[in-house]
Amino acid sequence: MYAIPYEYYEKYKIRRYGAHGTSHWYVSSKVPELIGKPAEGLKQIVLHIGNGASASAEIDGKPIETSMGLTPLEGLVMGGRTGDIDPAAVFHLIRNAHMDVDELDDLFNKKSGMMNCSLVTSLPSYIIQMSSGVIS
């Protein structure tokens, strides 16, 4: 849930949904097998890192929190998505850059993220180049 009036959840279903569920489920189900312990009692942070990226907190093999929200736009910075951004940035761009909703959607979902901040086109490539000192 978000800290907005509950009526918006009821009427418009605005809440955190998360994404990459199959990937998170697979990883969290493999960990007990790999470490030889049951899922019950395990606390995990599971990461999905690709051109899209997300994190989940899991207890007993079940997700209790996710980095993503209503859409995959919220959360970690991704290949082409902003990740978390101050909502006031939207108002600022509407007022000062005279952008409309479709332009902002395109900017935040396709023309931002790692590929536009660093000129590297994927998160795995970015991580490899960062760790090898090619970019900083």
Explain the meaning of each model-derived region.
Residues 96-136:
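A mobile "lid/hinge" subdomain adjacent to the ATP/sugar-phosphate binding pocket shared
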Residues 1-95:
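Glycine-rich phosphate-binding loop of actin/hexokinase-like ATP-binding domains
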